[in-house]
Amino acid sequence: MGTFTYERQVYLADTDGAGVVYFNQFLQMCHEAYESWLSSEHLSLQNIISVGDFALPLVHASIDFFAPAHCGDRLLVNLTITQASAHRFCCDYEISQAESAQLLARAQTHHVCIALPERKKAPLPQPWQTAICDLDHP
């Protein structure tokens, strides 16, 4: 299975009063990794928004936490695609410390392609299917 890796530093704004990454920021980092992967595949979320013939709503998100991260930490977000079909796909994420490889969190997001304006399930456009297949089956 192929993996896309996104590296990110933890900033002070990512942390809470206890000095650790606030829980929702881990999901934000996952979405940053997703957008970075799309960019590497020349797939534009802005193009989806401006053309407006389909959308990829996130219909489920889950995350499990194993260890904290702190301001200044370098993190790796590894993204793999699972459970891909003609109209949906799941992104699995593992967030770890860049230096020690300690696993901090695992997350998953489910995305479904819908036609607009009907908002009915639709097949993913071919460029998306190709990119997903490339990451799902290297």
Curated annotation (Swiss-Prot):
<protein>
    <recommendedName>
        <fullName>1,4-dihydroxy-2-naphthoyl-CoA hydrolase</fullName>
        <ecNumber>3.1.2.28</ecNumber>
    </recommendedName>
</protein>
<dbReference type="GO" id="GO:0061522">
    <property type="term" value="F:1,4-dihydroxy-2-naphthoyl-CoA thioesterase activity"/>
</dbReference>
<dbReference type="InterPro" id="IPR008272">
    <property type="entry name" value="HB-CoA_thioesterase_AS"/>
</dbReference>
<comment type="pathway">
    <text>Quinol/quinone metabolism; 1,4-dihydroxy-2-naphthoate biosynthesis; 1,4-dihydroxy-2-naphthoate from chorismate: step 7/7.</text>
</comment>
<feature type="active site">
    <location>
        <position position="16"/>
    </location>
</feature>
<dbReference type="InterPro" id="IPR029069">
    <property type="entry name" value="HotDog_dom_sf"/>
</dbReference>
<comment type="similarity">
    <text>Belongs to the 4-hydroxybenzoyl-CoA thioesterase family. DHNA-CoA hydrolase subfamily.</text>
</comment>
<dbReference type="InterPro" id="IPR006684">
    <property type="entry name" value="YbgC/YbaW"/>
</dbReference>
<dbReference type="GO" id="GO:0042372">
    <property type="term" value="P:phylloquinone biosynthetic process"/>
</dbReference>
<dbReference type="InterPro" id="IPR022829">
    <property type="entry name" value="DHNA_CoA_hydrolase"/>
</dbReference>
<dbReference type="Pfam" id="PF13279">
    <property type="entry name" value="4HBT_2"/>
</dbReference>
<dbReference type="InterPro" id="IPR050563">
    <property type="entry name" value="4-hydroxybenzoyl-CoA_TE"/>
</dbReference>
<comment type="pathway">
    <text>Cofactor biosynthesis; phylloquinone biosynthesis.</text>
</comment>
<dbReference type="GO" id="GO:0047617">
    <property type="term" value="F:fatty acyl-CoA hydrolase activity"/>
</dbReference>
<comment type="function">
    <text>Catalyzes the specific hydrolysis of 1,4-dihydroxy-2-naphthoyl-CoA (DHNA-CoA) to 1,4-dihydroxy-2-naphthoate (DHNA), a reaction involved in phylloquinone (vitamin K1) biosynthesis. Is not active on benzoyl-CoA, phenylacetyl-CoA and aliphatic acyl-CoA thioesters.</text>
</comment>
<keyword id="KW-0378">Hydrolase</keyword>
